[in-house]
């Protein structure tokens, strides 16, 4: 986010939490999407169906969340992953939520949405950011909801061994306009600064009394 004004105001912390990966189910096949003699219409129908499937997945994810509030699965966030190796892609729900936000903002036909893609128009974000998976070994400590500093455990015990905790963090890029101010802000009238903001996610931690448990901790989630 871009903080604009002088003096600067503190950014409030937003809470969030969601399931790690709900089951994905799709229906239909290519034959149901287009006729054998109409390839052009088939491709258009396929694109529209893909958009419809994504929106259904988002709705299904919300239902799954509400039905599993008291289960262990609710302990995981879309930005937290338990894995034996470094994840190769961003969290699935993270991508779906980003796509949903884009569709809601566009509120137009699929064809217009594709042509209005910011990448096609050469638009640039106000603040540049970078996202990557980090381990508990890199984080070591974090601040929980009570303001206490807790130790982030690197490994989580599971029935067949142990898995590592990975966190998908987003922060302001050290290059570009991060130090010079927000892009597009008139420096003659405003002081601006790109700042990394945080949100809460659930993670396995240990407090200063050696008590281990799942707690909400703050991690970098946006710029």
From Swiss-Prot:
Where in or outside the cell it occurs: the entry states: Secreted
Q: Which InterPro entries match?
A: Brain-der_neurotrophic_factor, Cystine-knot_cytokine, Nerve_growth_factor-like, Nerve_growth_factor-rel, Nerve_growth_factor_CS
User: Under the GO molecular function aspect, what terms does this record hold?
Assistant: growth factor activity; nerve growth factor receptor binding
Gene that encodes the chain: BDNF
**SUPFAM superfamilies xref list:** Cystine-knot cytokines
> Would I find Secreted among this entry's keywords?
yes
Q: Which residues form the propeptide?
A: 6-114
What Pfam families would the database entry show?
NGF (PF00243)
Indicate the secretion signal residues.
1-5
Q: Which family does it belong to?
A: Belongs to the NGF-beta family.
The record's disulfide annotation reads 127-194, 172-223
The UniProt entry, under PROSITE patterns, shows: NGF_1, NGF_2
A biological process (GO) of this protein is: nerve growth factor signaling pathway
Its recorded name reads Neurotrophic factor BDNF precursor form
């Amino acid at each position: 986010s871009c903080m604009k004004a002088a003096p600067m105001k503190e950014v409030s912390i937003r809470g969030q939490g969601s399931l790690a990966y709900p089951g994905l189910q799709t229906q239909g096949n290519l034959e149901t999407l287009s006729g054998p003699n109409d390839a052009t219409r088939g491709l258009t129908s396929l694109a529209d169906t893909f958009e419809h499937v994504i929106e259904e997945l988002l709705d299904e994810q919300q239902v799954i969340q509400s039905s599993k509030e008291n289960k262990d699965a609710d302990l995981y966030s879309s930005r937290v992953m338990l894995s034996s190796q470094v994840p190769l892609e961003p969290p699935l729900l993270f991508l779906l939520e980003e796509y949903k936000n884009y569709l809601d903002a566009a509120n137009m036909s699929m064809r217009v949405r594709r042509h209005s893609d910011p990448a096609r128009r050469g638009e640039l974000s106000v603040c540049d950011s970078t996202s990557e998976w980090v381990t508990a070994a890199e984080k070591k400590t974090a601040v929980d909801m009570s303001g206490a500093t807790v130790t982030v455990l690197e490994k989580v015990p599971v029935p067949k061994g142990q898995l590592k905790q990975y966190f998908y963090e987003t922060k302001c890029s050290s290059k570009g306009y991060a130090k010079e101010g927000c892009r597009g802000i008139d420096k003659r009238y405003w002081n601006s600064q790109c700042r990394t903001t945080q949100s809460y996610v659930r993670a396995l931690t240990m407090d200063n009394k050696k008590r281990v448990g799942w707690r909400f901790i703050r991690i970098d989630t946006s710029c």
